[in-house]
Amino acid sequence: MAHPGLPIARSGKTRLAVWVGLLGFFLSFACLAIPMYVIRPFRPQDPWQLDAALTVRGLAPWISAVCAIAALAAVARAWRDRMRHWLRCALATLSLLTVVGSVLTHVNVFEMMFHPYPQPEFESAAAAKVDSDDKVLSVTLHGESRAYPIRTMGYHHIVNDTVGDTPIAVTYCTLCHTGLVWSRMVDGQTLHFRLAGINNGNALMRDEETSSIWQQSTGIAIFGPFRGRQLQLVHCDELSFALWRKEEPRGLVLKPDAQYASEYDDKDWEKHIEKTRTVVDTSKSGIAPHELMLGVTAAGESKAFPVKSILTAKLIQDRIANIPLLLVVGPDHASMRAFKAGPMTFVSTADSALPDTGAITRDAETGSNWNFQGCAIDGRMAGRCLEPVDSFKDYWFDWMNHHPGTLVFRS
């Protein structure tokens, strides 16, 4: 005679196997869906949502692995107990999807869209096939100069490099037009950065050593063991390639990665970016979200200078944190630099009848002419150079978001 509790027991095991299979599938799916939903372009992220999504993404490989094992165990139970054929097939399908989900938690979706450039290659300035008016990020350290074309950087976002024995991360975010170079040294450790996602329109970076997440436009770690730490900024300039090549004829230029050259941005990529939707509300400021700014931070104070105003004026003298500031436009009428002006007053010579000496400004005190590198080329001040000030271009929505107390230059 059959045991009276056997059908009930078997029914209970069936329900348990089904619930384990379903739970494993949904948890594995959640581990993928939550980070992808929160850390994606054109969606506002608040700190707690971002923190939760990054936490889930960090735990996802472990959670999904447990789910996959549980789902496989449920399938094994279903076959051993000879459950109905359709039920075994359903559990097997759920198990397969759970295993696939577990594998996908190890995949960086953003690097599938924008592939890294792990072994960057360089060529001479003379050999580089870069248009004269294309923009490059210029870095010079210990006498070694390199240029990173923005159309290349806009796809890869991050290039880990070493210039003048200094490990650096050259970074660029096309959505907010920010090109910044950061030191990769933290507490004596050399970090290697990869693209990790996006936060309110600005790229996120993850270091391979600690899995900390860093904001590209501030260099501040917002998640992980290094949370709250800030990378050291390395001075760089955004210049036209023709101007950089004239200044650094022996410099090296980042070569395009042949595998992904077809993916690089078009020459007029900025026009397309300016039409994209932003997630930071700038309406109260009265400034359009895609107004391009030259941002300067000194002594804890930030100020945004509209690029259009700088290009029109060709020279702007202002103050930030009581520091006299000089902004000048280069001889290519496109590149910009910022310097500490000291006690001197400068006037632009861009429209004067000066011969082609490289002079772009003259000081009122001595009449000395100064070039775009900030150095006097004649007069009593000949040979002296102004101190460069770190500055970078940024769309207004991103600058305002990361510098909430910023001042704005009004022409």
Model-derived features: positions:
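N-terminal acidic, proline/glycine-rich, low-complexity intrinsically disordered segments
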Residues: 1-3
